[in-house]
Amino acid sequence: MKQAINKSKRSSRRRLPPIRSGEIIDYKNINLLRRFISEQGKILSRRMNRLTSKQQRLMTIAIKRARVLALLPFLNNEN
């Protein structure tokens, strides 16, 4: 009984997309790239950041380019 009640209480409201329509995935857009990196500097998975597979591919390429150009750190060891 409880399972049926919990399933019906799910919100039907859609979550906002993580990338707005005007934003371009680019290695120079550091503020956008930082939203998709964990505190340790790892690239977040598609499930966590709710990107499409194409957006995730472009985001990964942009993050790796920014790391090579020293715009983003490879690891974030602030300890």
UniProtKB/Swiss-Prot annotation:
Primary subcellular site in the record, as a coarse category: plastid
Keyword Transcription regulation part of the UniProt annotation: no
Signal peptide feature range: none
A Pfam family per the record: Ribosomal_S18
Subcellular location: Plastid, Chloroplast
Cellular component aspect of the GO annotation: chloroplast; mitochondrial small ribosomal subunit
Disulphide bridges: none
Keywords: Chloroplast, Plastid, Ribonucleoprotein, Ribosomal protein, RNA-binding, rRNA-binding
Biological process according to GO: translation
Keyword Chloroplast: yes
GO molecular function: small ribosomal subunit rRNA binding; structural constituent of ribosome
Subunit structure: Part of the 30S ribosomal subunit.
Similarity field: Belongs to the bacterial ribosomal protein bS18 family.
The name this protein goes by in its record: Small ribosomal subunit protein bS18c
Organism: Physcomitrium patens
Gene name as annotated: rps18
